[in-house]
């Protein structure tokens, strides 16, 4: 995918801004444990997709999604004041599936390592057939 430096710079600024807003606290307990993992800004700078992770199960993810949905307007206004942009992109929050995927890969690798450790070593080199 082609990189657009201005979109990348704006994405980095939005990520820092949203992280700062979350750190200071929104007063919404559904978002207390949320972590912003990245921001992708569309080529036309009209939409910023903010990716987040939150510990817990799918109920926690659903609660966080509802929390972000209700806070979108506040976060956008706060960012507009922080970034001083002429036009602020629409903010859309998305759960970062890559984090969960990475955790599942890590779990599989740990299980394979445990199975390997459980196989007794005969101390002999493998025989050739």
UniProtKB/Swiss-Prot annotation:
One of its GO terms (biological process) is maturation of SSU-rRNA. One of its GO terms (cellular component) is cytosol. One of its GO terms (molecular function) is ribosomal small subunit binding. It holds the Pfam family RBFA. Keywords: Cytoplasm, Ribosome biogenesis. It comes from the Bacteria. It is found in: Cytoplasm. One of several proteins that assist in the late maturation steps of the functional core of the 30S ribosomal subunit. Associates with free 30S ribosomal subunits (but not with 30S subunits that are part of 70S ribosomes or polysomes). Required for efficient processing of 16S rRNA. May interact with the 5'-terminal helix region of 16S rRNA. Belongs to the RbfA family. HAMAP family: RbfA. Monomer. Binds 30S ribosomal subunits, but not 50S ribosomal subunits or 70S ribosomes. This is Ribosome-binding factor A. It comes from Desulfosudis oleivorans (strain DSM 6200 / JCM 39069 / Hxd3) (Desulfococcus oleovorans). The gene is rbfA.
